[in-house]
Amino acid sequence: MTKVLVFGTFDGLHEGHKNFFKQALRQAQGKPKNRPYLIVVVGRDSTIVKTKGRLPKFNEQERLKAIQDSKLVSEARLGNEGSNPYKVIKEVMPDVICLGYDQTHFTEKLTEKIKEMGMNVQIKRLEPFEPEKYHSSLLNKT
């Protein structure tokens, strides 16, 4: 089994997120242990307030439940609370970490933090899927 890890807010699960999960699952193809196991880490409300300056439209439990209900996802969990957002990587021990095309929070030191943990993890930046149509910031405008 190839563990693929993704992170995000996922504030209203939409087709862009589903495409993101499908792209992440494809990253396991061609790997020695190629049965994909997709782990989704859902950002905590407190983390989102710190990084985006606002609460998400849906609270962390609602967002987690929506991800858990997705047939594409093997495991869903809330992100860590506290000062070490990278802790979950050591807990999960992924083979691949996939980042969204527009994902910037906690990514600038990701390679460095993985090396500090003594891990060998591939990091892949995935392609957008109709970002002018499927982006939570557009879909959640009310």
Q: Which residues does each PLM region occupy?
A:
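Nucleotidyltransferase catalytic core that binds NTPs
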Residues: 1-142
